[in-house]
Amino acid sequence: WHTADNTEIAVFSAMAHDVMRSVKHENFLLMESTPSMTNWTPVSMLKRPGMHLLSSMQAMAHGSNSVQYFQFRKSRGSCEKFHGAVVDHVGNSGPYDFAKTENTRVFRDVQQVGAVLREMNARGDVYGTAVKPQVAIVYDVENRWALDAAAGPRNKDKDEKYVETLLSHYRPFWDAGVQVDIVDMDGDISGYKLVIAPMLYMYRAGFEQKMRAFV
């Protein structure tokens, strides 16, 4: 977050969550979210106040049943010692001082998310609930690989353009609050009212028949 227009990042994150949910059409687990920043971008930006809760709730809204972290505590060495963590280096040089740790903004942000998740769990109206989108966008990894590996008139940014094209189709539904499944060519498309299949450089066996039957 905060490395570009946050709206564009939010759209990409929403589609990524929908990809995970659509794999089995079930809820998924968000495993490695950072509570503060990463350590692999050109400039590692700390999440602004309220951003951790907002991004965590976005994952829940798109079907996650958890908000888990990488990492719990920053290490003393190795390549991820400055990657974001629930517990910072603060208070870890000697005997562990919980009072110092809990006074960091990042720790309080994590506490806030935990409190909201406990409230949601107590109500029992969010965890495990499912959405049934009427719109599907076909995103096929093998099609992406084939497109990226092909040599032809245009060989620049093929992989990025595929993702950009998917996002350009996804964005209007996101803006309108319309739920979308992201399916591959092996998936069942018969139950949708609208199927969007951009940049089909490659057809898997049987997909043409599915599309003809759909229309």
Spell out what each predicted region is.
Residues 1-215:
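Carbohydrate-binding surfaces of carbohydrate-active enzymes
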